[in-house]
Protein backbone atom coordinates (compact mmCIF):
# COMPACT_ATOMS: atom_id res chain seq x y z
CA UNK A 1 0.00 0.00 0.00
CA UNK A 2 1.41 3.37 -1.03
CA UNK A 3 1.24 6.39 1.29
CA UNK A 4 -0.67 8.31 -1.39
CA UNK A 5 -3.22 5.48 -1.62
CA UNK A 6 -3.61 5.47 2.16
CA UNK A 7 -4.22 9.21 2.26
CA UNK A 8 -6.79 8.93 -0.54
CA UNK A 9 -8.65 6.11 1.18
CA UNK A 10 -8.66 7.82 4.58
CA UNK A 11 -10.23 10.84 2.91
CA UNK A 12 -13.07 8.70 1.64
CA UNK A 13 -16.31 9.47 3.55
CA UNK A 14 -17.25 5.80 3.81
CA UNK A 15 -13.88 4.93 5.29
CA UNK A 16 -14.30 7.71 7.84
CA UNK A 17 -17.79 6.49 8.74
CA UNK A 18 -16.50 2.95 9.17
CA UNK A 19 -13.24 3.44 11.06
CA UNK A 20 -13.84 6.58 13.12
CA UNK A 21 -16.60 5.09 15.34
CA UNK A 22 -14.53 1.96 16.00
CA UNK A 23 -11.30 3.81 16.76
CA UNK A 24 -13.14 6.49 18.74
CA UNK A 25 -14.93 3.90 20.88
CA UNK A 26 -11.71 2.00 21.55
CA UNK A 27 -9.86 5.18 22.59
CA UNK A 28 -12.69 6.25 24.87
CA UNK A 29 -12.82 2.83 26.56
CA UNK A 30 -9.04 2.85 26.91
CA UNK A 31 -9.08 6.31 28.49
CA UNK A 32 -11.70 5.17 31.00
CA UNK A 33 -9.81 1.96 31.77
CA UNK A 34 -6.51 3.78 32.39
CA UNK A 35 -8.06 6.34 34.75
CA UNK A 36 -8.14 5.85 38.51
CA UNK A 37 -11.39 5.10 40.33
CA UNK A 38 -12.20 8.73 41.13
CA UNK A 39 -11.41 9.91 37.61
CA UNK A 40 -13.56 7.15 36.08
CA UNK A 41 -16.64 8.55 37.76
CA UNK A 42 -15.75 12.03 36.50
CA UNK A 43 -15.15 10.78 32.95
CA UNK A 44 -18.45 8.91 32.53
CA UNK A 45 -20.56 11.89 31.42
CA UNK A 46 -17.90 13.40 29.08
CA UNK A 47 -17.30 10.00 27.46
CA UNK A 48 -21.02 9.53 26.97
CA UNK A 49 -21.25 12.99 25.39
CA UNK A 50 -18.32 12.31 23.03
CA UNK A 51 -19.91 9.03 21.95
CA UNK A 52 -23.16 10.81 21.11
CA UNK A 53 -21.31 13.61 19.30
CA UNK A 54 -19.45 11.14 17.09
CA UNK A 55 -22.68 9.28 16.36
CA UNK A 56 -24.41 12.51 15.34
CA UNK A 57 -21.48 13.42 13.07
CA UNK A 58 -21.84 10.05 11.32
CA UNK A 59 -25.54 10.73 10.78
CA UNK A 60 -24.80 14.16 9.30
CA UNK A 61 -22.19 12.67 6.96
CA UNK A 62 -24.54 9.87 5.88
CA UNK A 63 -27.27 12.41 5.18
CA UNK A 64 -24.89 14.53 3.09
CA UNK A 65 -23.89 11.47 1.07
CA UNK A 66 -27.56 10.94 0.27
CA UNK A 67 -27.88 14.37 -1.28
CA UNK A 68 -27.08 13.81 -4.95
CA UNK A 69 -25.89 17.34 -5.49
CA UNK A 70 -23.37 17.03 -2.65
CA UNK A 71 -21.26 14.27 -4.16
CA UNK A 72 -22.73 13.87 -7.64
CA UNK A 73 -24.19 10.46 -6.85
CA UNK A 74 -26.39 8.99 -9.58
CA UNK A 75 -28.43 6.13 -8.14
CA UNK A 76 -29.35 4.75 -11.55
CA UNK A 77 -25.74 4.34 -12.68
CA UNK A 78 -24.08 1.73 -10.56
CA UNK A 79 -23.26 -1.95 -10.32
CA UNK A 80 -24.80 -3.33 -13.49
CA UNK A 81 -23.99 -0.56 -15.95
CA UNK A 82 -20.68 0.77 -14.70
CA UNK A 83 -19.44 -2.31 -12.83
CA UNK A 84 -19.13 -0.05 -9.80
CA UNK A 85 -21.23 0.26 -6.72
CA UNK A 86 -21.79 3.97 -6.73
CA UNK A 87 -19.78 6.88 -7.96
CA UNK A 88 -19.34 8.25 -4.46
CA UNK A 89 -17.46 6.27 -1.88
CA UNK A 90 -15.77 3.79 -4.20
CA UNK A 91 -12.11 3.50 -3.42
CA UNK A 92 -9.70 0.65 -2.91
CA UNK A 93 -6.14 -0.12 -2.01
CA UNK A 94 -4.39 -3.39 -1.29
CA UNK A 95 -4.40 -4.60 2.31
CA UNK A 96 -2.91 -8.06 1.80
CA UNK A 97 -2.10 -7.82 -1.88
CA UNK A 98 -0.43 -11.21 -2.06
CA UNK A 99 -3.75 -13.01 -1.57
CA UNK A 100 -6.06 -10.41 -3.12
CA UNK A 101 -7.44 -8.69 -0.02
CA UNK A 102 -8.12 -4.98 -0.46
CA UNK A 103 -9.83 -2.10 1.27
CA UNK A 104 -12.64 -1.55 -1.22
CA UNK A 105 -15.71 0.33 -0.08
CA UNK A 106 -18.67 1.64 -2.02
CA UNK A 107 -22.32 2.52 -1.70
CA UNK A 108 -25.36 2.06 -3.89
CA UNK A 109 -29.14 2.13 -3.65
CA UNK A 110 -29.22 -1.15 -1.69
CA UNK A 111 -26.60 -0.25 0.89
CA UNK A 112 -27.35 3.45 1.36
CA UNK A 113 -30.74 3.02 3.11
CA UNK A 114 -29.11 0.60 5.55
CA UNK A 115 -26.18 2.95 6.19
CA UNK A 116 -28.51 5.90 6.78
CA UNK A 117 -30.74 3.78 9.03
CA UNK A 118 -27.72 2.69 11.07
CA UNK A 119 -26.47 6.23 11.60
CA UNK A 120 -30.01 7.28 12.57
CA UNK A 121 -30.58 4.53 15.14
CA UNK A 122 -27.23 4.72 16.93
CA UNK A 123 -27.70 8.23 18.40
CA UNK A 124 -31.38 7.49 19.10
CA UNK A 125 -30.47 4.40 21.17
CA UNK A 126 -27.90 6.46 23.05
CA UNK A 127 -30.49 9.14 23.82
CA UNK A 128 -33.14 6.62 24.89
CA UNK A 129 -30.66 5.09 27.36
CA UNK A 130 -29.08 8.43 28.27
CA UNK A 131 -29.67 8.23 32.04
CA UNK A 132 -29.08 4.50 32.31
CA UNK A 133 -26.55 3.76 35.05
CA UNK A 134 -24.48 1.46 32.89
CA UNK A 135 -21.04 3.05 32.88
CA UNK A 136 -18.84 4.52 30.17
CA UNK A 137 -18.34 1.27 28.25
CA UNK A 138 -22.04 0.93 27.40
CA UNK A 139 -22.29 3.82 24.96
CA UNK A 140 -18.81 3.13 23.58
CA UNK A 141 -19.84 -0.40 22.63
CA UNK A 142 -22.85 1.03 20.81
CA UNK A 143 -20.55 3.40 18.90
CA UNK A 144 -18.21 0.53 18.03
CA UNK A 145 -21.16 -1.42 16.69
CA UNK A 146 -21.99 1.50 14.40
CA UNK A 147 -18.63 1.28 12.65
CA UNK A 148 -18.88 -2.50 12.29
CA UNK A 149 -22.40 -2.30 10.85
CA UNK A 150 -21.45 0.38 8.34
CA UNK A 151 -18.44 -1.74 7.42
CA UNK A 152 -20.76 -4.62 6.54
CA UNK A 153 -22.92 -2.44 4.32
CA UNK A 154 -20.12 -0.69 2.40
CA UNK A 155 -17.40 -3.37 2.11
CA UNK A 156 -16.90 -4.66 -1.43
CA UNK A 157 -14.04 -6.96 -0.51
CA UNK A 158 -15.60 -10.15 0.85
CA UNK A 159 -12.73 -10.83 3.25
CA UNK A 160 -13.21 -7.40 4.84
CA UNK A 161 -16.98 -7.89 4.67
CA UNK A 162 -16.63 -11.08 6.71
CA UNK A 163 -14.35 -9.39 9.26
CA UNK A 164 -16.89 -6.65 9.89
CA UNK A 165 -19.70 -9.22 9.92
CA UNK A 166 -18.03 -11.02 12.82
CA UNK A 167 -17.03 -7.77 14.50
CA UNK A 168 -20.70 -6.85 14.97
CA UNK A 169 -21.08 -9.87 17.26
CA UNK A 170 -18.61 -8.60 19.86
CA UNK A 171 -20.37 -5.40 21.03
CA UNK A 172 -23.79 -7.06 21.02
CA UNK A 173 -22.47 -10.08 22.93
CA UNK A 174 -21.11 -7.84 25.70
CA UNK A 175 -24.19 -5.61 25.74
CA UNK A 176 -26.33 -8.67 26.46
CA UNK A 177 -23.82 -10.34 28.79
CA UNK A 178 -23.04 -7.29 30.94
CA UNK A 179 -26.33 -5.36 30.97
CA UNK A 180 -28.97 -7.96 30.12
CA UNK A 181 -31.66 -9.63 32.20
CA UNK A 182 -31.51 -12.53 34.64
CA UNK A 183 -30.74 -15.15 31.97
CA UNK A 184 -28.30 -12.91 30.09
CA UNK A 185 -25.45 -15.43 30.09
CA UNK A 186 -27.54 -18.09 28.40
CA UNK A 187 -28.99 -15.60 25.89
CA UNK A 188 -25.59 -14.09 25.06
CA UNK A 189 -23.99 -17.49 24.54
CA UNK A 190 -26.89 -18.73 22.41
CA UNK A 191 -26.81 -15.56 20.31
CA UNK A 192 -23.07 -15.87 19.73
CA UNK A 193 -23.06 -19.61 18.99
CA UNK A 194 -25.97 -19.47 16.54
CA UNK A 195 -24.77 -16.46 14.60
CA UNK A 196 -21.11 -17.46 14.61
CA UNK A 197 -21.91 -20.99 13.46
CA UNK A 198 -24.08 -19.61 10.66
CA UNK A 199 -21.29 -17.29 9.54
CA UNK A 200 -19.03 -20.31 9.10
CA UNK A 201 -21.35 -21.50 6.31
CA UNK A 202 -21.12 -18.05 4.76
CA UNK A 203 -17.32 -18.11 5.05
CA UNK A 204 -17.20 -21.48 3.32
CA UNK A 205 -19.20 -20.02 0.44
CA UNK A 206 -16.92 -16.98 0.24
CA UNK A 207 -13.83 -19.20 0.07
CA UNK A 208 -15.33 -21.26 -2.75
CA UNK A 209 -16.05 -18.03 -4.64
CA UNK A 210 -12.51 -16.84 -3.97
CA UNK A 211 -10.84 -19.95 -5.37
CA UNK A 212 -13.07 -19.99 -8.45
CA UNK A 213 -12.68 -16.42 -9.72
CA UNK A 214 -9.96 -15.29 -12.10
CA UNK A 215 -7.80 -12.38 -10.98
CA UNK A 216 -4.54 -13.48 -12.58
CA UNK A 217 -4.07 -10.03 -14.07
CA UNK A 218 -3.55 -8.61 -10.57
CA UNK A 219 -0.28 -10.50 -10.31
CA UNK A 220 -0.57 -11.80 -6.74
CA UNK A 221 0.63 -15.23 -5.66
CA UNK A 222 -2.82 -16.86 -5.82
CA UNK A 223 -4.22 -15.21 -8.93
CA UNK A 224 -7.48 -14.80 -7.00
CA UNK A 225 -9.34 -11.92 -5.38
CA UNK A 226 -12.00 -11.35 -2.73
CA UNK A 227 -13.32 -8.34 -4.66
CA UNK A 228 -17.10 -8.45 -5.11
CA UNK A 229 -17.12 -6.17 -8.16
CA UNK A 230 -14.59 -8.41 -9.91
CA UNK A 231 -16.73 -11.48 -9.24
CA UNK A 232 -19.83 -9.63 -10.37
CA UNK A 233 -18.28 -8.85 -13.76
CA UNK A 234 -17.45 -12.52 -14.41
CA UNK A 235 -20.58 -14.30 -15.58
CA UNK A 236 -20.91 -17.67 -13.80
CA UNK A 237 -17.35 -17.40 -12.50
CA UNK A 238 -17.98 -20.75 -10.79
CA UNK A 239 -18.09 -23.09 -13.79
CA UNK A 240 -19.93 -25.99 -12.17
CA UNK A 241 -23.67 -25.45 -11.85
CA UNK A 242 -23.81 -27.94 -8.99
CA UNK A 243 -21.09 -26.07 -7.10
CA UNK A 244 -22.92 -22.79 -7.66
CA UNK A 245 -26.00 -24.36 -6.07
CA UNK A 246 -23.95 -25.53 -3.09
CA UNK A 247 -22.47 -22.06 -2.57
CA UNK A 248 -25.92 -20.49 -2.85
CA UNK A 249 -27.29 -22.85 -0.18
CA UNK A 250 -24.31 -22.11 2.08
CA UNK A 251 -25.07 -18.41 1.74
CA UNK A 252 -28.76 -19.03 2.36
CA UNK A 253 -28.05 -20.87 5.62
CA UNK A 254 -25.73 -18.15 6.85
CA UNK A 255 -27.99 -15.25 5.97
CA UNK A 256 -31.29 -16.94 6.94
CA UNK A 257 -29.95 -17.58 10.45
CA UNK A 258 -29.04 -13.93 10.83
CA UNK A 259 -32.37 -12.71 9.43
CA UNK A 260 -33.65 -14.98 11.12
CA UNK A 261 -35.95 -17.41 9.37
CA UNK A 262 -37.72 -20.45 10.75
CA UNK A 263 -36.31 -22.98 11.74
CA UNK A 264 -33.04 -21.20 12.67
CA UNK A 265 -34.71 -18.41 14.62
CA UNK A 266 -34.72 -19.67 18.20
CA UNK A 267 -31.81 -17.51 19.32
CA UNK A 268 -33.75 -14.29 18.63
CA UNK A 269 -36.53 -14.31 21.28
CA UNK A 270 -34.07 -15.12 24.07
CA UNK A 271 -31.63 -12.46 22.89
CA UNK A 272 -34.36 -9.82 22.69
CA UNK A 273 -35.91 -10.60 26.07
CA UNK A 274 -32.56 -10.52 27.88
CA UNK A 275 -30.88 -7.68 25.97
CA UNK A 276 -30.90 -4.12 27.32
CA UNK A 277 -33.16 -1.67 25.51
CA UNK A 278 -30.39 -0.33 23.26
CA UNK A 279 -29.34 -3.87 22.39
CA UNK A 280 -32.86 -4.87 21.37
CA UNK A 281 -33.32 -1.68 19.34
CA UNK A 282 -30.12 -2.25 17.36
CA UNK A 283 -30.65 -5.99 17.04
CA UNK A 284 -34.11 -5.54 15.53
CA UNK A 285 -33.40 -2.29 13.75
CA UNK A 286 -30.18 -3.07 11.91
CA UNK A 287 -28.50 -6.37 12.80
CA UNK A 288 -31.33 -8.53 11.47
CA UNK A 289 -31.17 -6.58 8.21
CA UNK A 290 -27.61 -7.78 7.71
CA UNK A 291 -29.05 -11.16 6.76
CA UNK A 292 -31.42 -9.77 4.12
CA UNK A 293 -28.78 -7.36 2.82
CA UNK A 294 -26.14 -10.09 2.52
CA UNK A 295 -28.56 -12.41 0.75
CA UNK A 296 -29.51 -9.74 -1.79
CA UNK A 297 -25.93 -8.56 -2.29
CA UNK A 298 -24.20 -11.93 -2.56
CA UNK A 299 -26.85 -14.63 -2.94
CA UNK A 300 -29.24 -13.01 -5.41
CA UNK A 301 -26.77 -10.80 -7.31
CA UNK A 302 -24.03 -13.38 -7.85
CA UNK A 303 -26.23 -16.47 -8.20
CA UNK A 304 -29.39 -15.41 -10.09
CA UNK A 305 -29.91 -18.83 -11.70
CA UNK A 306 -29.93 -20.46 -8.28
CA UNK A 307 -32.47 -17.94 -6.98
CA UNK A 308 -34.82 -19.04 -9.74
CA UNK A 309 -33.98 -22.71 -9.12
CA UNK A 310 -34.68 -22.46 -5.38
CA UNK A 311 -37.60 -20.05 -5.64
CA UNK A 312 -39.94 -22.62 -4.07
CA UNK A 313 -37.59 -23.02 -1.09
CA UNK A 314 -37.57 -19.26 -0.56
CA UNK A 315 -41.36 -19.22 -0.70
CA UNK A 316 -41.59 -21.98 1.91
CA UNK A 317 -39.12 -20.28 4.25
CA UNK A 318 -40.92 -16.97 3.89
CA UNK A 319 -44.41 -18.38 4.32
CA UNK A 320 -43.52 -20.59 7.29
CA UNK A 321 -41.77 -17.69 9.04
CA UNK A 322 -44.68 -15.35 8.35
CA UNK A 323 -47.32 -17.77 9.67
CA UNK A 324 -45.29 -19.21 12.55
CA UNK A 325 -44.26 -15.81 13.88
CA UNK A 326 -47.82 -14.50 13.74
CA UNK A 327 -49.39 -17.55 15.42
CA UNK A 328 -46.79 -17.79 18.20
CA UNK A 329 -47.31 -14.09 18.97
CA UNK A 330 -50.90 -14.85 19.93
CA UNK A 331 -49.77 -16.91 22.90
CA UNK A 332 -47.11 -14.57 24.27
CA UNK A 333 -47.57 -12.88 27.63
CA UNK A 334 -44.15 -11.19 27.66
CA UNK A 335 -44.20 -7.90 25.75
CA UNK A 336 -40.63 -8.17 24.45
CA UNK A 337 -41.00 -11.78 23.39
CA UNK A 338 -44.15 -10.90 21.47
CA UNK A 339 -42.37 -8.13 19.55
CA UNK A 340 -39.46 -10.52 18.90
CA UNK A 341 -41.73 -13.12 17.28
CA UNK A 342 -43.41 -10.41 15.25
CA UNK A 343 -39.95 -9.67 13.82
CA UNK A 344 -39.69 -13.29 12.70
CA UNK A 345 -43.02 -12.86 10.92
CA UNK A 346 -41.94 -9.65 9.20
CA UNK A 347 -38.65 -11.18 8.10
CA UNK A 348 -40.71 -13.90 6.42
CA UNK A 349 -42.41 -11.17 4.40
CA UNK A 350 -38.97 -10.06 3.19
CA UNK A 351 -38.25 -13.55 1.87
CA UNK A 352 -41.65 -13.62 0.15
CA UNK A 353 -40.91 -10.33 -1.57
CA UNK A 354 -37.58 -11.61 -2.87
CA UNK A 355 -39.17 -14.91 -3.94
CA UNK A 356 -41.63 -13.14 -6.24
CA UNK A 357 -38.67 -12.25 -8.52
CA UNK A 358 -40.62 -9.12 -9.40
CA UNK A 359 -39.08 -5.63 -9.20
CA UNK A 360 -41.97 -4.42 -7.03
CA UNK A 361 -41.64 -7.41 -4.70
CA UNK A 362 -37.90 -6.97 -4.23
CA UNK A 363 -38.32 -3.22 -3.73
CA UNK A 364 -41.07 -3.98 -1.20
CA UNK A 365 -38.75 -6.39 0.62
CA UNK A 366 -36.03 -3.74 0.84
CA UNK A 367 -38.55 -1.16 2.03
CA UNK A 368 -39.77 -3.65 4.64
CA UNK A 369 -36.17 -3.88 5.88
CA UNK A 370 -36.14 -0.10 6.19
CA UNK A 371 -39.63 0.29 7.67
CA UNK A 372 -39.13 -2.51 10.19
CA UNK A 373 -35.84 -0.84 11.11
CA UNK A 374 -37.83 2.20 12.25
CA UNK A 375 -40.94 0.62 13.76
CA UNK A 376 -39.40 -2.30 15.64
CA UNK A 377 -36.85 -0.16 17.55
CA UNK A 378 -39.76 2.08 18.57
CA UNK A 379 -41.59 -0.92 20.03
CA UNK A 380 -38.49 -2.13 21.86
CA UNK A 381 -37.92 1.37 23.22
CA UNK A 382 -41.48 1.23 24.59
CA UNK A 383 -40.77 -2.21 26.07
CA UNK A 384 -37.64 -0.84 27.72
CA UNK A 385 -39.45 2.11 29.25
CA UNK A 386 -42.27 -0.20 30.39
CA UNK A 387 -39.71 -2.39 32.14
CA UNK A 388 -37.85 0.62 33.56
CA UNK A 389 -40.90 2.33 35.04
CA UNK A 390 -43.09 -0.65 35.95
CA UNK A 391 -40.43 -3.33 36.55
CA UNK A 392 -42.22 -5.94 34.45
CA UNK A 393 -42.78 -7.03 30.86
CA UNK A 394 -45.83 -9.20 31.54
CA UNK A 395 -48.81 -7.98 29.53
CA UNK A 396 -51.38 -9.37 31.97
CA UNK A 397 -49.85 -7.52 34.91
CA UNK A 398 -50.68 -4.07 33.53
CA UNK A 399 -54.04 -2.68 32.45
CA UNK A 400 -55.16 0.86 31.75
CA UNK A 401 -51.67 2.13 30.97
CA UNK A 402 -53.06 5.25 29.27
CA UNK A 403 -54.25 6.62 32.62
CA UNK A 404 -50.80 6.81 34.21
CA UNK A 405 -48.43 6.91 31.20
CA UNK A 406 -50.13 8.68 28.28
CA UNK A 407 -46.90 9.35 26.36
CA UNK A 408 -45.79 5.74 26.67
CA UNK A 409 -49.24 4.59 25.59
CA UNK A 410 -49.20 6.89 22.57
CA UNK A 411 -45.83 5.62 21.38
CA UNK A 412 -46.96 2.05 21.97
CA UNK A 413 -50.02 2.63 19.78
CA UNK A 414 -47.95 4.19 16.98
CA UNK A 415 -45.52 1.26 17.06
CA UNK A 416 -48.24 -1.37 17.06
CA UNK A 417 -50.22 0.35 14.31
CA UNK A 418 -47.10 0.64 12.19
CA UNK A 419 -46.17 -2.98 12.74
CA UNK A 420 -49.62 -4.32 11.86
CA UNK A 421 -49.55 -2.36 8.59
CA UNK A 422 -52.07 0.42 9.21
CA UNK A 423 -52.49 2.66 6.13
CA UNK A 424 -50.38 5.83 6.24
CA UNK A 425 -47.67 3.95 8.16
CA UNK A 426 -44.37 2.79 6.67
CA UNK A 427 -45.13 -0.90 7.21
CA UNK A 428 -48.28 -0.62 5.09
CA UNK A 429 -46.29 0.53 2.03
CA UNK A 430 -43.94 -2.45 2.26
CA UNK A 431 -46.74 -4.97 2.82
CA UNK A 432 -48.83 -3.69 -0.09
CA UNK A 433 -45.83 -3.73 -2.44
CA UNK A 434 -45.00 -7.33 -1.53
CA UNK A 435 -48.63 -8.50 -1.77
CA UNK A 436 -49.16 -6.89 -5.18
CA UNK A 437 -45.97 -8.49 -6.47
CA UNK A 438 -47.02 -11.81 -4.93
CA UNK A 439 -50.32 -11.62 -6.82
CA UNK A 440 -48.45 -10.78 -10.05
CA UNK A 441 -46.27 -13.85 -9.59
CA UNK A 442 -48.61 -16.41 -8.01
CA UNK A 443 -52.17 -15.18 -8.49
CA UNK A 444 -54.70 -15.95 -5.80
CA UNK A 445 -52.13 -17.69 -3.62
CA UNK A 446 -51.69 -14.15 -2.28
CA UNK A 447 -54.59 -14.93 0.06
CA UNK A 448 -52.23 -17.00 2.26
CA UNK A 449 -49.93 -14.13 3.31
CA UNK A 450 -52.87 -11.71 3.29
CA UNK A 451 -54.82 -13.76 5.84
CA UNK A 452 -51.70 -14.13 7.97
CA UNK A 453 -51.33 -10.36 8.10
CA UNK A 454 -54.86 -10.23 9.53
CA UNK A 455 -53.66 -12.50 12.35
CA UNK A 456 -50.81 -10.04 12.87
CA UNK A 457 -53.33 -7.25 13.31
CA UNK A 458 -55.32 -9.40 15.73
CA UNK A 459 -52.51 -10.01 18.20
CA UNK A 460 -51.42 -6.39 18.22
CA UNK A 461 -54.96 -5.05 18.70
CA UNK A 462 -55.63 -7.62 21.42
CA UNK A 463 -52.48 -6.65 23.32
CA UNK A 464 -53.13 -2.94 22.83
CA UNK A 465 -56.65 -3.25 24.19
CA UNK A 466 -55.53 -5.10 27.31
CA UNK A 467 -52.42 -3.09 28.08
CA UNK A 468 -53.48 0.45 27.25
CA UNK A 469 -57.24 0.67 27.65
CA UNK A 470 -58.64 -2.25 29.62
CA UNK A 471 -58.73 -1.83 33.39
CA UNK A 472 -60.38 -3.17 36.49
CA UNK A 473 -63.01 -1.68 38.85
CA UNK A 474 -62.78 -0.50 42.43
CA UNK A 475 -65.13 -1.35 45.31
CA UNK A 476 -67.60 1.22 44.01
CA UNK A 477 -67.57 -0.26 40.50
CA UNK A 478 -65.60 2.67 39.11
CA UNK A 479 -63.10 1.90 36.31
CA UNK A 480 -59.47 1.99 37.46
CA UNK A 481 -56.10 1.06 36.00
CA UNK A 482 -54.66 -2.23 37.16
CA UNK A 483 -51.12 -1.58 38.37
CA UNK A 484 -48.55 -4.38 38.51
CA UNK A 485 -47.41 -5.65 41.89
CA UNK A 486 -43.83 -5.12 40.70
CA UNK A 487 -44.18 -1.39 41.51
CA UNK A 488 -43.78 -2.33 45.21
CA UNK A 489 -45.67 0.75 46.31
CA UNK A 490 -43.95 3.15 43.89
CA UNK A 491 -46.04 5.71 42.06
CA UNK A 492 -46.51 4.95 38.34
CA UNK A 493 -44.56 7.29 36.05
CA UNK A 494 -44.56 8.33 32.43
CA UNK A 495 -41.47 8.23 30.21
CA UNK A 496 -38.58 10.66 30.64
CA UNK A 497 -37.65 13.45 28.21
CA UNK A 498 -34.83 11.48 26.58
CA UNK A 499 -36.98 8.38 26.09
CA UNK A 500 -39.71 10.57 24.64
CA UNK A 501 -37.27 12.28 22.25
CA UNK A 502 -36.03 9.03 20.73
CA UNK A 503 -39.52 7.56 20.41
CA UNK A 504 -40.92 10.75 18.85
CA UNK A 505 -38.29 10.72 16.11
CA UNK A 506 -39.01 7.09 15.24
CA UNK A 507 -42.77 7.56 15.39
CA UNK A 508 -42.69 10.62 13.14
CA UNK A 509 -40.51 8.82 10.59
CA UNK A 510 -42.87 5.83 10.60
CA UNK A 511 -45.71 8.17 9.64
CA UNK A 512 -43.67 10.25 7.17
CA UNK A 513 -42.56 7.18 5.22
CA UNK A 514 -46.11 5.85 5.30
CA UNK A 515 -47.48 9.03 3.74
CA UNK A 516 -44.54 9.72 1.41
CA UNK A 517 -42.37 6.58 0.91
CA UNK A 518 -40.03 8.48 -1.40
CA UNK A 519 -38.97 10.92 1.31
CA UNK A 520 -35.24 11.50 0.84
CA UNK A 521 -35.52 9.40 -2.33
CA UNK A 522 -35.67 6.10 -0.45
CA UNK A 523 -38.35 4.14 -2.31
CA UNK A 524 -37.20 5.40 -5.70
CA UNK A 525 -33.65 4.21 -5.18
CA UNK A 526 -34.90 0.85 -3.90
CA UNK A 527 -37.13 0.47 -6.96
CA UNK A 528 -34.28 1.40 -9.31
CA UNK A 529 -32.01 -1.18 -7.71
CA UNK A 530 -34.67 -3.90 -7.84
CA UNK A 531 -35.52 -3.14 -11.48
CA UNK A 532 -31.89 -3.37 -12.55
CA UNK A 533 -31.44 -6.58 -10.56
CA UNK A 534 -34.33 -8.24 -12.38
CA UNK A 535 -33.44 -6.81 -15.79
CA UNK A 536 -29.71 -7.47 -15.82
CA UNK A 537 -29.37 -10.47 -13.49
CA UNK A 538 -32.49 -12.57 -13.03
CA UNK A 539 -33.83 -12.36 -16.59
CA UNK A 540 -31.03 -10.95 -18.80
CA UNK A 541 -32.15 -12.98 -21.83
CA UNK A 542 -35.37 -10.98 -21.95
CA UNK A 543 -33.51 -7.68 -22.40
CA UNK A 544 -33.87 -6.37 -25.96
CA UNK A 545 -31.00 -5.30 -28.22
Q: What are these regions, as identified by a protein language model?
A:
Residues 42-56, 186-198, 405-409, 496-506:
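Alpha-helical transmembrane segments and their helix-start/interface "positive-inside/aromatic belt" motifs
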Residues 51-60, 120, 143-144, 249-251, ...:
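Alpha-helical transmembrane segments
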Residues 53-70, 195-207, 505-519:
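Hydrophobic alpha-helical membrane-insertion segments
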Residues 215, 405-407, 461-545:
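Cytoplasmic/organellar membrane-interface segments at the starts of transmembrane helices
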Residues 2-15, 27-128, 136-140, 220-225, ...:
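Transmembrane helix-loop-helix hairpins at membrane boundaries of multipass inner-membrane proteins
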Residues 124-131, 147-159, 173-471:
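Hydrophobic transmembrane alpha-helices and their helix-loop junctions in integral membrane proteins
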Residues 166:
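Short phosphate-coordinating micro-motif centered on Lys-Gly-acidic
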Residues 55-68, 145, 289-291, 416-420:
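A generic, lipid-embedded transmembrane alpha helix
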Amino acid sequence: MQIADLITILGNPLTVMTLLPILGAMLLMLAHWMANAEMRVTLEKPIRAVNLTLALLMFILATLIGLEETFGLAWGEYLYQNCQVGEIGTGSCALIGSIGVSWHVGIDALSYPMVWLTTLLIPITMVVEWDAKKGAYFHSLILMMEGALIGVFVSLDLFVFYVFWELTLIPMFFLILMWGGEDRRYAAQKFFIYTFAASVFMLAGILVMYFNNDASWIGNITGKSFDFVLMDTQTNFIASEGLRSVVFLLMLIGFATKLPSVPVHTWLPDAHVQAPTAGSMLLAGVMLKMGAYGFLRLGVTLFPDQVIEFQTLLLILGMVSLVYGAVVCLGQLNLKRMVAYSSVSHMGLIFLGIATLEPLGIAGAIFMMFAHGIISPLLFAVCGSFKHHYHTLEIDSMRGLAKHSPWMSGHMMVGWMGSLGLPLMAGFVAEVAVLIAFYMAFGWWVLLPAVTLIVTAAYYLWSMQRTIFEGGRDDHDHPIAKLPSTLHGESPRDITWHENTGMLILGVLAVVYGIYPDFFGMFEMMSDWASLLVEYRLYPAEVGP
